[in-house]
């Protein structure tokens, strides 16, 4: 039977019989292949697969022996409770292991954007929208007007409030941005802050004295806007700052009318909790309670129509 040499087994290269007797790579004289080489020298009648399986068995046996010794050592250490001091040491080690925290990798902070050239109005507006404070600071340091507006009469303050960029808002107000300026929709910065839903900006503007009951083109107050957009925290803070709970918009709707119509349960509960009037009628003569009944009747009618249509379809399919 033809046998394979260890060199052939490991490298996959065939060697001539003449050279194989005198050639033995240094890598095979020591290390993990040493045992296989010795076995081959002792019994050249064994096949390469026999040598390989023997080698694996030996390695596996050594590994199992090491594991058993390690386990035995751990058990001996655990069972060494000769005094209260030993017990105290074990308890302290367990506490340390439990309290060990994995340190989060330190993220390299991005280098601040360096603005060298002049900042035009378009860049200024874009910076307010994208929260680029260095661009805002450069524009203001170059004596730029913080109250400049676009074709919709919207200022950088309006944009920053709608996007929730608190630091930009603070910088603009510090530079003289007017809080009560209105855009083409006659919305103030507070209207836009309520649309954006950033409570910290709402708090900041109110602390600076902005009108909490300002009206836009539809006669809506910031509270109307907060209720319609579902900004519960902003609405609650406005109410706590004595915003008008029962203010009517152009359609005669109060914030409660809007909350009921839009089926905003949390808003309805909030407004009731703070004492909103449920008897006020809008221009259609409807109170918030009327809207609830109207919604229920509309839903009932919708389901009845759906049921009737299903019955008719099933009846026609029989023919």
From Swiss-Prot:
GO molecular function: RNA polymerase II-specific DNA-binding transcription factor binding
Subcellular location: Nucleus
Ranges of the ANK repeats in the UniProt entry: 152-181, 185-214, 218-247, 251-280, 284-315
Sequence segments annotated as region (Disordered): 1-26, 44-71
Entry keywords, A to Z: ANK repeat, Nucleus, Repeat
SUPFAM superfamilies found in the cross-reference section: Ankyrin repeat (SSF48403)
Any Pfam family hit: Ank_2
Signal peptide: none
One record GO biological process: negative regulation of gene expression
A Gene Ontology term for the protein's cellular component: nucleus
Compositional bias annotation for Basic and acidic residues: 59-71
Function as written in the Swiss-Prot or TrEMBL entry: May act as a nuclear transcription factor that negatively regulates the expression of cardiac genes.
PANTHER family in the cross-refs: ANKYRIN REPEAT DOMAIN-CONTAINING PROTEIN 1 (PTHR24126:SF7), ANKYRIN REPEAT, PH AND SEC7 DOMAIN CONTAINING PROTEIN SECG-RELATED (PTHR24126)
Protein name, as recorded: Ankyrin repeat domain-containing protein 1
Species the sequence originates in: Gallus gallus (Chicken)
């Amino acid at each position: 039977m033809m046998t394979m040499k260890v060199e052939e087994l490991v490298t996959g290269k065939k060697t001539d019989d003449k050279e194989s007797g005198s050639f033995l790579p240094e890598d095979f004289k020591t290390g993990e292949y040493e045992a296989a080489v010795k076995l081959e020298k002792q019994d050249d009648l064994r096949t390469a697969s026999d040598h390989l399986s023997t080698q694996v068995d030996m390695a596996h046996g050594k590994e199992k022996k090491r594991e058993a010794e390690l386990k035995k050592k751990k058990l001996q250490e655990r069972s060494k409770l000769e005094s209260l001091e030993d017990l105290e040491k074990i308890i302290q080690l367990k506490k340390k292991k439990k309290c060990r925290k994995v340190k989060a990798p330190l993220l390299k902070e991005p280098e601040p954007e360096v603005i060298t050239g002049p900042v035009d109005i378009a860049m200024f507006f874009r910076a307010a929208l994208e929260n680029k404070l260095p661009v805002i600071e450069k524009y203001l340091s170059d004596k730029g007007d913080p109250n400049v507006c676009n074709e919709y009469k919207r200022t950088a303050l309006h944009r920053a409030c709608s996007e929730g960029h608190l630091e930009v808002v603070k910088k603009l107000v510090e530079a003289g941005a007017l809080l009560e300026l209105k855009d083409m929709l006659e919305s103030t910065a507070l209207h836009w802050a309520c649309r954006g839903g950033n409570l910290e900006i709402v708090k900041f503007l109110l602390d600076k004295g902005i009108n909490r009951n300002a009206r836009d083109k539809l006669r809506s107050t910031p509270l109307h806007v907060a209720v319609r957009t579902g900004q519960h925290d902003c609405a609650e803070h406005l109410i706590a700052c004595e915003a008008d709970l029962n203010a009517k918009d152009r359609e005669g709707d109060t914030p409660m009318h809007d909350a009921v119509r839009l089926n905003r349960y949390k808003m309805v509960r909030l407004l009731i909790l703070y004492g909103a009037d449920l008897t006020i009628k809008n221009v259609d003569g409807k109170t918030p309670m009327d809207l609830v009944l109207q919604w229920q009747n509309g839903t009932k009618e919708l389901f009845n129509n759906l049921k009737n249509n299903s019955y008719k379809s099933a009846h026609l399919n029989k023919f």
